[in-house]
Amino acid sequence: MGKSKVLVVGGTGYVGRRIVKASLEHGHETFILQRPEIGLDIEKLQILLSFKKQGAILVEASFSDHKSLVDAVKLVDVVICTMSGVHFRSHNLLTQLKLVEAIKDAGNIKRFLPSEFGMDPALMGHALEPGRVTFDEKMTVRKAIEEANIPFTYISANCFAGYFAGNLSQMKTLLPPRDKVLLYGDGNVKPVYMDEDDVATYTIKTIDDPRTLNKTVYLRPPENILTHKELIEKWEELIGKQLEKNSISEKDFLSTLKGLDFASQVGVGHFYHIFYEGCLTNFEIGENGEEASELYPEVNYTRMDQYLKVYV
């Protein structure tokens, strides 16, 4: 059986461009949705053209033109959507419902991977307002997929290293501190940190794998399941210096929600669930899930001490 043809929706974005790269590297005929709304966004256009030079095929279609979406979907076997659900950048998760309708009408798709790539929204029904909107919208998309009997794989990629590791999980910065660091509670709750390129590699490996059909794939490589303290220690070893640590209690952390703008409240809520509640590792993977590093032991995933070296 040949490798699936792949359509990436959101191929110029933070995750999307990595998915495109991984798809091409793994030998898939790779299509990228090119939306007329790109307008005068020269940077996005340059990314698309660079992928075209590498062999990707650009397909013009618009979310405001159902037929164009159906025609685009009919060209491929697998659709991967990477539209942003991050509130401080752009937030388009429910736009995927139009893509679900197109996939349903096209009738040929063997696998759809919607824009997930974070915490498992099925486990976040208790999430704090207003941050729960992200999970609620992802569940709305899931419901539409499953009601339409579209074959799916959901990717739970946990904490992107660029947002959570490079800054030692400090809010309002993307760079690691060199003197003082804020510790969440006792710092012993375990998140999972993932290099974004590894997220893309694991994602592409799932698309033709019968073991991942209609399942959630959790990215939990064992050496990247680290407490906040352990992550900080890796940085301290790299720079040869102990940081001054100040702990913030759960109560005090939640009190910082007051007076913040909407996007910041969403972020604080998500940090609470990750670093105080431990929502990424406080459950066993059930029969409807698989763990990526167990499925694909051949992937030499990036460890966080290795990841942090570039910040030194």
From Swiss-Prot:
EC number of this enzyme: 1.3.1.-
Pfam families found in the cross-reference section: NmrA
Binding site for substrate: 270
EC class name: oxidoreductase
UniProt keyword terms in alphabetical order: NADP, Oxidoreductase
Stored CDD domains: PCBER_SDR_a
One BP term from GO: lignan biosynthetic process
Active site residues of this protein: 138
Residues that, per the record, bind NADP(+): 10-16, 35, 44, 142
Stored Gene3D superfamilies: NAD(P)-binding Rossmann-like Domain, UDP-galactose 4-epimerase, domain 1
InterPro entries (alphabetical): NAD(P)-bd_dom_sf, NmrA-like, NmrA-type/Isoflavone_red_sf, PCBER-like
MF annotations from Gene Ontology: pinoresinol reductase activity
Sequence similarity: Belongs to the NmrA-type oxidoreductase family. Isoflavone reductase subfamily.
Protein name: Isoflavone reductase homolog
Lineage: Eukaryota, Viridiplantae, Streptophyta, Embryophyta, Tracheophyta
